[in-house]
Amino acid sequence: MDIFGSGEHRPRVLFICTANVDRSRTAEDLYADDPRYEVKSCGVAPFATIVVTRDLLEWADHIFVMNESEDHHVTALRRRFPGLSKEVVDLDIEDRWKRGHPELVRRIIARLEPHIGKPKAKPATAPKA
């Protein structure tokens, strides 16, 4: 199946940061209404809003972490889930902005565009007459 969903289910995309508060939630917000994907987000820290689990990793067709160099997201996943064989893409986005900040939005879109394209909203439906 290609990444743009020509198969039977929409590709499932998982966004991961540390606490699942700002970066991964912003990415989820951006793609939540995109008809091409199913999206979820979580964090690697035990105090994360939604903590990453093996079930979430198995659910995902595509896994994106926010930052390996500062936050060690890939390392944390490989350590906690040693049998993880799926590709994990590091977006290299630092933890410097709050959820929805314009610079965070710009960086997320720029880093994800080569992988899953820019976010698209679901088409609006006409009101019933």
Where are these regions (language model features)?
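Phosphate-binding/catalytic loops
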Residues: 78-129
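Mid-chain, well-packed structural core segment of small domains
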Residues: 56-93
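Conserved active-site segments centered on acidic
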Residues: 1-62, 72, 109-126
